[in-house]
Regions:
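N-terminal Sec-pathway targeting helices
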Residues: 1-13
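Intrinsically disordered, low-complexity segments enriched in glycine/proline and serine/threonine
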Residues: 6, 16, 556-558
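Terminal signal-anchor or tail-anchor transmembrane helices
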Residues: 11-21
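Sequence signature of WD/YWTD-type beta-propeller architectures
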Residues: 20-529, 535-543, 547, 552-572
């Protein structure tokens, strides 16, 4: 990237950040003289958690000092300090002593102006249950339109929630657009959605986890190649034993990227949800992808699936599908009037959660999950606890991803009365995942910032959740976090992910730079991958090969374009 582009990008992020801060503060003013903003009252911390930052707000300018007192209710330990400013972090050594000497009882935090009469206080406590595993998440700028244009600004990060160090960068910069990732229950395999090109949005990698994970031709697959038509392969999820992947085929979505202004468009910068789709399961041993009977009904969209920990059932989102034009196969709805009706909320789209037997890929009867269906709301993002007892899901008035009103609910896996989690903050609570020991959920929320933060909440054996804590070390200026997923490995385990797969965009970039030697080298690697191409891909490659001086290869791909399926073909025998 040129120096000019870097300056422009930094300037844009700075302006966006300043505006977001102004708007957020305007909407979150506290009428009292001063009030404690964080930690939340009655928050429950993991025993390994590093020292949090204590923050407070005030509407009266204070040039004086503050007195803070942090003490165990049993009287065994206390920390008293006088300081300037509206933020304080105890030393790690004192915080560790406080946690140990609290004996898992109450910890009081008291705040007052130096010499003042009024005191604000909150109570905290430390759980006996550790988190015990790291979290892999995506870090990116907003709005999405900027992230898509600057893939090098997106990273995959791996965080040890008990570490005092910064998160580990597992993959710096994206070579192509990347989205959902999942792990097998034993933490030995990873599945990662990384596009294979502009037209093939169905690229997917499955790899064993090691210190360095290579994404290359050995572990690449394309849902589009298998289906012989364009598909996203939305919300793909590895089975607990790592043998199967449940995904969405024949999918079609409503997608709208909003312009940078107004501010709300920056914060919630995209509308995206599936309106058509069948569930399908890929068997890694047999190398067969087969639609799941009972969850492949044309009249419904069936997507956003997850497994029960025993691998016997699949829980997924279902809604009445939009009709298709049988003459054209599209993965994005093109009817702009229809899209605008969804954007303006003149039309609704609501999902229910269903559960279906896997039955070795033979499926069965899909049944609605009581408490997560038929409630007049949209229910989505099911996540089953590893002990098989609880189902946490999101609920909003409409749609699916990035909903401002998204709230998390919990219900027994067999269905029942759903209960709203106490961990829900004021704006967007979503993309939750269970710790391997079934005692914590990690999730994303805009409740403390218009940039998305990571939070952690305890859930006990009875499904009762505690007040959450903020994962401060995941915060980076001008970046959001999303897609947090636990890896069933020791908390301090790290790995690196490297992308070593060639697609047309790489060759196109080399040709644009007039680096024809590099372009020819990439073309050789591309052919060695035995790539899947649509007709338009063959035409584009033919033109590039001609520019590269490879006339015979150019003619070969021009001829292939005449006999290869077009990306908008509806069906192909």
């Amino acid at each position: 990237m040129s120096k000019t582009n870097i300056i422009i990008a930094v300037s844009v992020f700075a302006v966006i950040s300043a505006v977001l801060l102004f708007v957020f503060n305007r909407h979150s003013r506290i009428p009292n003289d001063f009030a404690i903003r964080y930690p939340f009252n009655k928050a429950l911390f993991p025993p390994e958690f590093p020292a949090p930052s204590f923050e407070w707000t005030t509407e009266v300018k204070n040039n004086g000092s503050w007195e803070v007192l942090l003490e165990t209710a049993n009287g065994k330990y206390s920390i008293h300090e006088v300081l300037k400013g509206n933020r304080w972090t105890p030393s790690e050594s004192k915080w560790d002593s406080l946690k140990v000497l609290s004996d898992f009882g109450k910890i009081w935090f008291r705040l007052s102006r130096e010499g003042g009469a009024r005191t604000e206080k909150i109570v905290l406590s430390v759980s006996r249950d550790s988190v015990g595993a790291p979290v892999l998440y995506r870090q990116m700028p907003i709005p999405f339109i900027i992230a898509e244009r600057r893939l090098d600004s997106m990273n995959f990060m791996l965080i040890n929630l008990g570490s005092k160090s910064k998160p580990h960068t597992a993959m710096k910069g994206f070579p192509v657009c990347g989205n959902c990732h999942s792990f097998s229950g034993d933490g030995n395999n990873i599945g990662l959605d990384l596009d294979a090109g502009l037209r093939d949005k169905g690229g997917y990698f499955i790899s064993p986890i090691s210190d360095t994970i290579m994404f290359n031709k050995e572990n690449f697959m394309s849902w589009s190649r298998i289906e012989k038509k364009r598909t996203f392969g939305l919300f793909s999820k590895l089975s607990p034993d790592g043998r199967y992947v449940v995904t969405t085929v024949r999918d079609r979505v409503i997608m709208k990227n909003f312009p940078v202004n107004p501010v709300e468009n920056i914060v919630f910068s995209q509308l995206f949800f599936p309106v058509n789709g069948h569930l399908a399961v890929y068997d890694r041993q047999e190398k067969i992808l087969k639609e799941l009977p009972g969850a492949n009904l044309e009249e419904y969209v069936q997507s956003n699936a997850t497994w029960t920990p025993d691998g016997k059932y699949i829980v997924y989102s279902r809604a009445a599908a939009l009709p298709r034009d049988s003459n054209i196969y599209e993965i994005n709805v093109q009817d702009q009037d229809l899209i605008d009706q969804y954007v303006s909320r003149k039309k609704s789209f609501k999902y229910d959660l269903y559960i279906i037997p896997f039955n070795n890929g033979n499926g069965g009867e899909a049944k609605p999950v009581r408490g997560a269906s038929g409630n007049g709301k949209s229910n989505y993002f099911p996540a089953v606890s590893p002990d098989g007892k609880w189902l946490v899901f999101c609920q909003a008035e409409n749609f699916m991803l990035l909903m401002p009103d998204s709230r998390m609910y919990i219900v027994p896996i067999g269905g029942g009365k759903a209960r709203e989690l106490r961990g829900n903050l004021s704006r967007m609570n979503s993309w939750h995942a269970w710790s391997p020991n079934s005692r914590w959920i990690v999730y994303a929320s805009k409740g403390m910032s218009l940039y998305t933060d990571m939070f952690l909440a305890h859930i006990d054996e009875n499904g009762e959740d505690a007040i959450p804590v903020l994962v401060e070390k995941a915060r980076v200026p001008y970046r959001v976090i999303n897609y947090p997923e636990f890896v069933n490995r020791k908390a301090g385990y790290t790995f690196n992910m490297k992308y070593d797969y060639v697609e047309l965009a790489h060759i196109k970039r080399a040709v644009a730079d007039r680096d024809y030697e590099k372009a020819r080298e990439l073309f050789g690697r591309l052919e060695d991958q035995n790539p899947f191409f649509f007709s338009e891909d063959c035409t584009e490659l033919s033109d590039m090969l001609k520019t590269m001086g490879l006339a015979s290869e150019s003619e070969k791909y021009a001829e292939m374009a005449k006999h290869t399926i077009n990306s908008n073909v509806f069906d192909q025998e």
